[in-house]
Amino acid sequence: MLSIVLVRPQMAQNIGMVARVMLNFNISNLIIVNPKKNDFFDIANATSCEALTQLNLTVVQNNDINIALKEALQDIHNVFALTTRSRDLTKASFYINDMNEHIQETQNNAFLFGCERTGLTNNELSLANYIISINSNPNFPSLNLAQAVGVCSYEYSKLKYLQEVNKNTKFENTNNLDRTKSLAIATVKENQYFLDDLFTRLSEKGFFKDSTKKEKNQHNIKEIFQKASLTSK
C-alpha cells in the first residue's frame, strides 16, 4: 500500500492538484502534515475536480513538526523522500525509476514531499529510509508539487503492475526467500521506539560523554540501523 505524504504544503490549489493526479493512478491515501492553512479543503477539492473527497485523507497537526511527522509515518515501513538537492546524508539514494528492488507492495510505503518553497529539511529527511530524485534537467530540476507526485505515482503504478505480472508468471522459490521478505519490516514507530530505548541505555552507560557531539553521534547511529532494514521481530 502506498501513501503520499505532504509536509507543510503552502497552497490549497497544490493539494487539490496532487489529489487529482493520485486518483489518476489509483492511489488513495493522502497524509498532510502541518498545512499552512487549516481551511484548505474546499479550495483543494474544487481544484481536484472533487477527487479529494474520494481519497483517504489524514491531516496531522502539531506545533512541533518532528512530532507531527513521526505520527504521520508511524505505521509506514519504507519512506521514500523526494529531493532535488544533494544532501550530506549517508542514506541510500537513487532515481525514482530505480526503486524496484527497494519497494514491496505487501508493505506500507510512503512518498514524502516537502513544502513547495523549501522542500524537506534535513531533520525531516532523517525519518526516511531512502532518498529519491527524478531524472530531470540538471539546469532546471525542480518540478512543481503535483508534477513530482504524478511522476512518482506513475512509476509506482508501473512497478506494481510489473510485480503482479511477475507473481503470476514466475515460479518463486520459497526456500530462498531473504530475511527482509520473509519477515515484516519494522515501521517508523517501531524503529523510533528501538532507537529511543537504545539511546537511553547508551546514555546511562556514559556513551555520550561529549555533549557537543551527542546529536551527531545519535544521527550516525540512527543512519546505521535505518540502512539495516530492521524487522519487527
For the regions a protein language model found, what residue spans apply to each?
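Post-transcriptional modification and biogenesis factors for structured RNAs
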Residues: 1-233
